[in-house]
């Protein structure tokens, strides 16, 4: 997979999930509304955090999004099913990048063309203190190693 959103980072696939395109996801233009793509990505992100036992805890710590982006490449329409692939970049002290691909699942059950790609910078915070904290070791173990630039 070529990582067009962050070409200098080697992509590390950590999660794949499928979900239906719902009738209510569409707007007056007859296609999935642009805001819904962020919901799809959010669901994939939280599904991965649940899978690795790092579900956000409002009374403790968890991830917050400080920047999110999405490139809309092809329209999605109801009915259909999508596959969302989640990739991660190397960790910082309290943050890492997540990248997502949204593909329409074909009639043959295989994921087809790329319809959207997006991502977010995730910062781990202590919610009551409203301060960033170091990433949990459970998350760091799942992220690709940090690459040092020449001369560093």
Where are these regions (language model features)?
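Small beta-barrel nucleic-acid-binding modules, principally OB-folds
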Residues: 59-80
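Catalytic strand-loop segment that frames the active site of acyl-thioester-processing enzymes
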Residues: 2-47
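Membrane-helix exit/interface motif
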Residues: 48, 52-54
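A broad, structural micro-motif
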Residues: 32, 63-65, 115
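Residue-level recognition of specific faces of alpha-helices
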Residues: 37-40, 64, 121
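HotDog/MaoC-like acyl-thioester-processing domains
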Residues: 1-17, 72, 76-79, 89-152
């Amino acid at each position: 997979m070529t990582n067009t959103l962050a070409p200098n980072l080697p992509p590390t696939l950590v999660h794949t999930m499928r979900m239906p395109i719902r009738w209510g996801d569409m707007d007056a233009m007859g296609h999935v509304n642009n805001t819904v793509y962020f919901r799809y990505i959010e669901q994939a992100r939280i599904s991965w955090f649940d899978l690795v036992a790092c579900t956000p805890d409002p009374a403790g710590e968890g991830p917050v999004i400080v920047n999110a982006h999405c490139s809309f490449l092809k329209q999605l329409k109801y009915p259909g099913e999508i596959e969302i692939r989640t990739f991660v970049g190397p960790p910082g002290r309290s943050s890492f990048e997540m990248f997502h691909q949204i593909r329409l699942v074909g009639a043959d059950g295989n994921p087809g063309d790329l319809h959207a790609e997006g991502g977010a910078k995730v910062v781990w915070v202590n919610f009551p203190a409203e301060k960033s904290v170091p990433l949990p070791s459970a998350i760091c173990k799942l992220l690709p190693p940090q690459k040092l630039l020449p001369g560093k």
